[in-house]
Amino acid sequence: MYFKGHSYVRSHIGAVSSSTGKPTAFRPDINGAVRSLALSPDKKILYVGGSFTRVNSVTRMNIAAFRTSTGRLTRFAPKVAGTVVAIAATSYRVYLGGTISQVNGRRRTEAAEVTTTGKLTAWAPVLDGWVRALLISPDKTRIFLGGGFHHVNGATYEGLGSVNPVTGTNEPFRNGLIPTYHDGRVSQATSLATNGTWIFAGAEGTGTRAFDGTLAFRPDSGRLVWRNTCLGATQTILYLRGVLYKGSHAHDCSSAGGFGPIRPHWQPHHLLAENPINGELLSWGTSARSVPQPIPDTNGGVRSELGPFAFATDGLHLFAGGDFTTVNTRRQEGLARFK
């Protein structure tokens, strides 16, 4: 990490001041990639998932936990075989998603649940593809899963499903929110968010004009509320103060009443704001209908060319992290804060 002329060595994870951006003393030594972060409801524990085997010279198999007050590694140490890509935590349970095949020596298929002490529970939904996103419903009666699967517990659910938080069995949910194609195209939910009433999903499609946009649905039934069909995959979404924010490489929102195809010089919009009521594009941070070019924006970066990969909030600000090197054409690498 680099801050105001000084370099700070960190191993796959670090922390910075939310007000200044200066790196803190939190510097665990993790020997592999970090793919997911989640706080316990009381914000005392930070769960870290990814593809690693050691933390601070102690064995931790793809999942670890730290005390936020001290930065110290806890005794939470379930042994997960497979990369942990998504985490959702309650006060007593931790739900895991990713490319999971076993936990504590017992078979699991892409998703699992452990207690806060690391003990494996009986919760074991069966999926035929990896899990990229997990969200606990506002009333805590459902777990929503998004990812590259076509079936949940043997029933057809394309890229998005809903299961019971205790039994892992399917809850009533409408298939088809993520479109099903029969021509080689495929779409999957990459990110989930909620405003306390509806659930929002962002999607990534593979193939020409496959669904890349966002949608909203009712948590009790899965009934579609709205769908925004902007083209250009959505990496992350976050709801904050009446606005649904989206990190993507959107390059054509004409079908959603926004900007048309960007040609001849393909330069997507990496940051967008949407109305959570109907999915229409907004001006950044407001509830008014947007002009075609929302601001701010990032570039795509030098590795993936996709820009933002993750959003977070302290309730007031939006933090964006990803593979970008500029914000509004000014140098800002990998992490930015917006008021």
Map each language-model feature to its residues.
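Extracytoplasmic surface signature
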Residues: 1-339
